[in-house]
Amino acid sequence: VVIGSWCLEGYKSYFGRKTPLTTLRTRDIDFLVPRPTRIRTSVDVPALLEDLGFVTDFHRGGYIRLIHPELIVEFLVPERGRGTDHPVRLPQLGINAQALRFLNMLEEGTITATLEGVRVRMPHPAAFALHKLLIAPRRQGRPSKQAKDRDAAVAVLEALRAHGAIELVREHLASMP
């Protein structure tokens, strides 16, 4: 599941090109691995992407990133329980992922949208917006990230309202624990 700033580009295809979403994508693209324990097939993701010019980078926290001159690929998993600062090993994918809070909000009710000509799964726009509003104040000492999260949330909420889908935000909000 693609998450993060790249979703805004996908939401443009989901809502239609006339939606006034500004898409300032970052160089990194985040992939949420929703249910790591359910992965049945082993795929060595770093080896697969190595053929495309990606290099494995071991981040200071122990999780890996795949770096290309034009793109950085990161893998995230929902943090469970009390959480930990340690990476989550996903041997069936050949990666270590970073666990972050509240990502479980993004794994339910995903949509399919077109991103750079490829059909991908991404969080429902309502879940994306609520998640951004939830995490923005938690980005202590990073005011530019806080503002970016709030701006993205407002833009997506406006697109939902413009398409008569604001009730979906209420439904997502009501389903939150």
List each model region and its residues:
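Compositionally biased terminal segments of proteins
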Residues: V1-P177
